[in-house]
Structure formats: C-alpha cells, structure tokens
C-alpha cells in the first residue's frame, strides 16, 4: 500500500495526470481571450501531414471541440478545466491538452493556432452532427 501511494505521488510530481472519469471533471468557463475559433496556419510538426489542419473551438462556458483533418475528420468534444493552475482541455477520450496563450496565438498539443472567424466546413459539419452542449461563440 505504501509503495502504491509513493508511485502515485511520483506520477503527480512528474506531471503525469490522468482523468479516470470525464463526467467528474469540473468545467471552467473560458477566459475572454480563448473563447472562439482557433486554427493552425501552415505546416505543424504535431500533425501527420503538412496539409493537415488542427482546430480548437471553445465556447464561453468552457465546452470544446478538438477537430483535426487531413484525409478524414476527427472531432473530439471536451471541456476546459484548471489543473494545477494550468488551463487544460480534457477530451471525452480523457486526453489532456494544456492551452497556453502566446500573444495573439495559442499553443495547444504542440501546435500553434491563431484565431479565425469560423471553423472549417468539415469541422462545422462535425458540429452539426454532434453539437456542443453550450452555444457556439
């Protein structure tokens, strides 16, 4: 039992966090600077191809859609939360992605994104099929 507690403490100290139940994650409203539509511009090392596009849609209430497209669209809903004072997107797949502001861009899962007026047509179609629980920006 003592070894298990020590192992758990080491994981927390190492920055490895895990979400056991998505439904238990406390949603945090988005700061004004984050609510809206974000998209990669140009090639990104974190994406599978130079032609791939990464998008993040964030509502004021803190609901999110992580949308990545290349030969197909992968759209995963989630919600913002604070983990150790860091703004983090937790997806329904229980993946954790820290969101950091850098001037007029954000850093998200190894990608640099800039604000755009609307999502791509493919991400908008994904939203039509599975709308977020709160109104879009």
From Swiss-Prot:
Lipidation sites, kind N-palmitoyl cysteine, are: 16
Name the lipidated positions (S-diacylglycerol cysteine): 16
Q: Report the subcellular localization.
A: Cell membrane
Name the membrane topology term: Lipid-anchor
Keywords, A to Z?
Answer: Cell membrane, Lipoprotein, Membrane, Palmitate, Signal
Primary location group:
membrane
Identify the stretch annotated as signal peptide in this record.
1-15
Claim: Protein biosynthesis is one of the keywords in the record: no
Q: Name one GO cellular component term.
A: plasma membrane
Q: Which Pfam families match?
A: YedD
Q: What is this protein called?
A: Uncharacterized lipoprotein YedD
Q: What organism is this sequence from? A: Escherichia coli (strain K12)
């Amino acid at each position: 039992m003592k070894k298990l507690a020590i192992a758990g403490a080491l994981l927390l100290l190492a920055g490895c966090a895990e979400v056991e139940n998505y439904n238990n994650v406390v949603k945090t409203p988005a700061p004004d600077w984050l609510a809206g539509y974000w998209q990669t511009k140009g090639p990104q090392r974190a994406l599978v191809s130079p032609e791939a596009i990464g998008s993040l849609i964030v509502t004021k209430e803190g609901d999110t859609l992580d949308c990545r497209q290349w030969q197909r669209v992968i759209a995963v809903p989630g919600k913002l939360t604070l983990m150790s004072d860091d703004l983090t997107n937790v997806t329904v797949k229980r993946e954790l992605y820290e969101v950091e502001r850098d001037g007029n861009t954000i850093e998200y899962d190894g990608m640099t994104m800039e604000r755009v007026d609307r999502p791509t047509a493919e991400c908008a179609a994904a939203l039509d099929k599975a709308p977020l629980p709160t109104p879009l920006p």
